[in-house]
Amino acid sequence: MTRVPRGYIARRRRTKMRSFASNFRGAHLRLNRMITQQVKRAFVSSHRDRGRQKRDFRRLWITRINAATRVYKVFDSYSKLIHNLYKKKLILNRKMLAQVAVSNPNNLYTISNKIKIIN
């Protein structure tokens, strides 16, 4: 029986996986089975960490806003600041507030003066 050379489909699949693994090192770059395992693992990690990144940044923004409100005596806490923002219907998200708190705390103070409730 004559030998039949393999088609291009498997080779195309392997080269596609190899292109994903172009920055790997050692056997993870050279051996096809290791490449497929590591690429699958990398995809799982990247998918998981896209969700985690959103949570981490939100936590970072909240921490920055809370620190700025306490240091500059804007409010007693972060939660009171956010509560009064919602009461006054000011649409400022946490990312914007954190940037203001870090770069220019005076503007945070003026924002707080706008939303403070006069009894």
Curated annotation (Swiss-Prot):
<dbReference type="GO" id="GO:0003735">
    <property type="term" value="F:structural constituent of ribosome"/>
</dbReference>
<dbReference type="GO" id="GO:0000027">
    <property type="term" value="P:ribosomal large subunit assembly"/>
</dbReference>
<dbReference type="InterPro" id="IPR049946">
    <property type="entry name" value="RIBOSOMAL_L20_CS"/>
</dbReference>
<protein>
    <recommendedName>
        <fullName>Large ribosomal subunit protein bL20c</fullName>
    </recommendedName>
</protein>
<keyword id="KW-0150">Chloroplast</keyword>
<dbReference type="GO" id="GO:1990904">
    <property type="term" value="C:ribonucleoprotein complex"/>
</dbReference>
<comment type="similarity">
    <text>Belongs to the bacterial ribosomal protein bL20 family.</text>
</comment>
<dbReference type="Pfam" id="PF00453">
    <property type="entry name" value="Ribosomal_L20"/>
</dbReference>
<keyword id="KW-0699">rRNA-binding</keyword>
<dbReference type="InterPro" id="IPR005813">
    <property type="entry name" value="Ribosomal_bL20"/>
</dbReference>
<dbReference type="GO" id="GO:0005840">
    <property type="term" value="C:ribosome"/>
</dbReference>
<comment type="function">
    <text>Binds directly to 23S ribosomal RNA and is necessary for the in vitro assembly process of the 50S ribosomal subunit. It is not involved in the protein synthesizing functions of that subunit.</text>
</comment>
<dbReference type="InterPro" id="IPR035566">
    <property type="entry name" value="Ribosomal_protein_bL20_C"/>
</dbReference>
<dbReference type="GO" id="GO:0019843">
    <property type="term" value="F:rRNA binding"/>
</dbReference>
<keyword id="KW-0934">Plastid</keyword>
<dbReference type="GO" id="GO:0006412">
    <property type="term" value="P:translation"/>
</dbReference>
<dbReference type="GO" id="GO:0009507">
    <property type="term" value="C:chloroplast"/>
</dbReference>
<keyword id="KW-0687">Ribonucleoprotein</keyword>
<keyword id="KW-0694">RNA-binding</keyword>
<keyword id="KW-0689">Ribosomal protein</keyword>
